[in-house]
Design a protein with these regions (language model features):
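A short, exposed loop/beta-hairpin motif centered on an aromatic-Gly-Thr core
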Residues: 50-54
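Short S/T/G/P-rich N-terminal loop/turn motif that feeds into the first structured element of a domain
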Residues: 1-48, 58-66, 78-107
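Short arginine-rich
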Residues: 71-76
Length: 107
């Protein structure tokens, strides 16, 4: 399992407004090969937005990143920080991490 962390500075939208704006993208991301899930993150107080993604393998995470960074750039999103990290599954199971979920599928 591989974790991808992405964050970037943002002036919004936040909350429900972001949900309305990004809903189509969220549904599109469900078709991402190897993606198990994505947690959407935002902090209007600090002006940060992004997500945490779980992938079945590092290759899938890197392939997604190659596709997603240009998409973010086309949306005017700059200064994107991204990290690809291995998941320690043994320790993560002890702390109840949701890493045994099936790969995301479109409804």
């Amino acid at each position: 399992m591989t974790l991808l962390q992405i964050d970037f500075p943002s002036h919004g939208p936040w909350g429900e407004e972001l949900t309305k704006m990004a809903s189509a993208l969220a549904h599109h991301l469900n078709n991402t090969p190897g993606m198990v899930w994505k947690i959407w993150t935002e902090n209007s107080r600090s002006g940060d937005c992004g997500g945490v993604y779980l992938f079945t393998d590092e290759s899938s995470a890197n392939d997604f990143l190659k596709e997603h960074l240009p998409r973010l750039d086309s949306m005017g999103i700059k200064d994107v920080r991204a990290k690809v990290l291995d998941v320690n599954e043994s320790l993560s199971h002890i702390t109840r991490a949701p890493i045994a979920a099936p790969v995301a599928k479109t409804a």
